[in-house]
Every structure is written in structure tokens, then in C-alpha cells.
Amino acid sequence: MDYKKMGSRVYIRMDKGDEILSCIRRVCCDMDIKSATFQGIGACDKVVVATFIPEKQDFLRHERNGMLEMISLQGNVVTDVNGRLKEHAHGMFSYLLPDSGEIAYLGGHLQSARISYTGEIVLDVVEDGFIGQQFDAVTGIDVWKLEGKA
């Protein structure tokens, strides 16, 4: 992995074997970034996404191995109530069905993804404040808490 800050953005190049969310967290820790949004593209060889099931307050896990094009990655990094960084990302991946050669898609809440060739991520750093996190009793999930200066 390599990264460089240019303006308010950090450009991250991920290499074969890098885990996307771990790398984003490491960059944020190294650069003392409290909150940011990110987007990216690339190729992966192992992806785990999940679908939230509201009635169970739990996720249904989906895992795929093999050549997966990361056609869209979007997410954010926030600071939780204990001061820890938390990533929240959704991704969309395409892959070939082996028998037909047709393209299939896998998308959802990203739990992990391992780079197979390269990943190109743009991290937009929140300036003049930060995004925290708080529990919302109505929905039963953690939501953004918009803060002033960090």
C-alpha cells in the first residue's frame, strides 16, 4: 500500500493481498484522521458482504472467492463514542459465471475484501469538524453524530 495527501484528499493505492478496510483504518490512524468519506475501484479475490435483516437486527453474510471487479466502493470513517475509528462501507462487485460466461453481481455492506491486483481509493477528509457516532433507539443502529471542531 502507498498513500499521499494532496489537498483535503488522500489517494491510496492498495496492492495484492491488502485488505481494504484495514488499510483505510491504518491510513486514518497514521494521519490522525478522525472522519472521512471514501470511494474506490479495483480488483479483489475474496469478498465478504452482508445484507441487514431488520427483524433480526443482524446481517446475512455472503462470501465470494475468485476474480471480482470492484465496480463501486463507497463508505465513511467515523469516531465512535469510545474514540475508536469505525468504517462503514458498501460495495458492488462483478464476476463471471463459470458455465455461461454471463456477468453476475454481488453487493452490500462490506465486511472484508482482499485486493488481487490493485485498489484505488480516494479518501475525502472531513475538515473543520468531525463525524461521531451515536446509538439511535428508534432504528436500533448506530448513526452519525455531527460534531464541531475535532
Tell me the role of every PLM-derived stretch.
Residues 1-31, 35, 39, 43-107, ...:
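N-terminal intrinsically disordered, cationic/polar leader segments
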